[in-house]
Amino acid sequence: MSQQVIIFDTTLRDGEQALQASLSAKEKLQIALALERMGVDVMEVGFPVSSPGDFESVQTIARTIKNSRVCALARCVEKDIDVAAQALKVADAFRIHTFIATSPMHIATKLRSTLDEVIERAVYMVKRARNYTDDVEFSCEDAGRTPVDDLARVVEAAINAGARTINIPDTVGYTMPFEFAGIISGLYERVPNIDKAIISVHTHDDLGIAVGNSLAAVHAGARQVEGAMNGIGERAGNCALEEVIMAIKVRKDIINVHTNINHHEIWRTSQTVSQICNMPIPANKAIVGSGAFAHSSGIHQDGVLKNRENYEIMTPESIGLNQIQLNLTSRSGRAAVKHRMEEMGYKDTDYNMGHLYDAFLKLADKKGQVFDYDLEALAFINKQQEEPEHFRLDYFSVQSGSSDIATASVKLACGEEIKAEAANGNGPVDAIYQAINRITGYDVELVKYDLNAKGQGKDALGQVDIVVNHHGRRFHGVGLATDIVESSAKAMVHVLNNIWRAAEVEKELQRKAQNKENNKETV
């Protein structure tokens, strides 16, 4: 029987570093639930010591997730480990992942230390983490540029200290697959207690070979792969988990290992991450790109029609991509919409049926026919905007032309009060944004604007994603409508609600901190 490769997802920790705007706790939980449904073994969900907000989101996910092991990152620093344990302790079981650099360059220039001191610190911190949990992972940062003999010393000491998983990262995406496999093989040859730990790998894509490096390491004996959905991450990104997972499945004949992933959830999880993180998937992206199963060559098309295996090494259905598109109309009842959502793999918790059906009827009245991609877009927006709103778009009107200055009139519900303003702008969208900013008084700077069609044809839904800068922080907003000006207005209102909610969360965190301080003084 083949051995299992543990899938360790770091989309919510390392992957998030690539985003232009930080995710809210609710958005992180949405992604965590999708990852749990896909069956990841371990999910690294944050760096709790970095901020009160990250602490809260790690705690929320740890409290909610039951079928995947929740993990948090900590440097080899006492406070990091203690805070990580505090955030994770609400989980039934959890992992602490601690790390320190081991390469000569990092030790000399970053840590200004010695290898012996690094080993001593690693041992102490692994033991400290073991006081909180028996599931401790230790990473040798920049292992790819660490001499194997040095690496073996660190690994042996960390295992003796109690680390159950040893992670070997190619932190800067520098090594070649044959080199990386050699590092893993070298550790198996040099570390006498290596059988007491699982060897993990964490690769980056700076040279475009993160997946190749991970697979080479698995072939050499690594039994955990770390990565992120869609390969998101800082610089050129992380190892794309969906690619590793499907490579292991498709080429089990030579790799002879398996994962416990539910492959039929890959496509949906990939889409969830892409939409929430506002990171579109390239059409030519392996496994999950829109062109991954497209055949434009006449020869290829003929071959696929005769036998799909002529040019397809896996099927769209194997990753959960249902290519059958059905349409509904305004005469379709609630039960029909719910049934179609179930057929597409959605659970009741993925959307609010009442809100979704209302949005469906409005769209059906406009378009006549509503397709699967419309429903999925509506369900996504429905989930993003289900929280209480302080701002709500009540009305807007725009006048613009090729030689006229665009003018917009906007009515906005601000709490219980309706406010109205008009403004000019450089085009209809800018005019609306100027009017909204006048109403709210929020000082926001638009730094990114994306428009994507959700479907086909002139009546397709248009999704607008924006990122704004507000007092040094970046916030993401999304809007959906068949009218792109309306989508743009909704996106700005969504972003303002996110800013408002962030301020409310900050007030609540300050209140909790003050209460904690008052309790200390009382004692």
From Swiss-Prot:
> Which cofactors, if any, are listed as required?
Mn(2+)
Q: Which residues form a coiled coil?
A: none
Pyruvate carboxyltransferase domain location is: 5-267
Instruction: Cite the Pfam families for this sequence.
Output: HCS_D2 (PF22617), HMGL-like (PF00682), LeuA_dimer (PF08502)
- Catalytic function, reaction form: 3-methyl-2-oxobutanoate + acetyl-CoA + H2O = (2S)-2-isopropylmalate + CoA + H(+)
* A Gene Ontology BP annotation from the UniProt entry: L-leucine biosynthetic process
* Record localization: Cytoplasm
Q: What InterPro entries does the record tag this protein with?
A: 2-IPM_HCS-like (IPR050073), 2-isopropylmalate_synth_dimer (IPR013709), AIPM/Hcit_synth_CS (IPR002034), Aldolase_TIM (IPR013785), LeuA/HCS_post-cat (IPR054691), LeuA_allosteric_dom_sf (IPR036230), LeuA_bact_synth (IPR005671), PYR_CT (IPR000891)
- Entry annotated with the keyword Cytoplasm: yes
Q: What is its main location?
A: cytoplasm
Q: Where is this region: Regulatory domain?
A: 392-523
The source's superkingdom equals Bacteria
What is one term from the GO cellular component aspect held by the record?
cytosol
A molecular-function term among this protein's GO annotations: manganese ion binding
Describe which pathway this protein belongs to, using the record's wording: Amino-acid biosynthesis; L-leucine biosynthesis; L-leucine from 3-methyl-2-oxobutanoate: step 1/4
Binding residues annotated for Mn(2+), in chain numbering: 14, 202, 204, 238
Q: Which UniProt keywords apply?
A: Amino-acid biosynthesis, Branched-chain amino acid biosynthesis, Cytoplasm, Leucine biosynthesis, Manganese, Metal-binding, Transferase
Q: Which purpose does this protein serve, as stated in its record?
A: Catalyzes the condensation of the acetyl group of acetyl-CoA with 3-methyl-2-oxobutanoate (2-ketoisovalerate) to form 3-carboxy-3-hydroxy-4-methylpentanoate (2-isopropylmalate).
Spell out the subunit comment: Homodimer.
Q: Which family does it belong to?
A: Belongs to the alpha-IPM synthase/homocitrate synthase family. LeuA type 1 subfamily.
Q: Which HAMAP family match?
A: LeuA_type1 (MF_01025)
Q: What is this protein called?
A: 2-isopropylmalate synthase
Query: Which gene underlies this protein?
Result: leuA
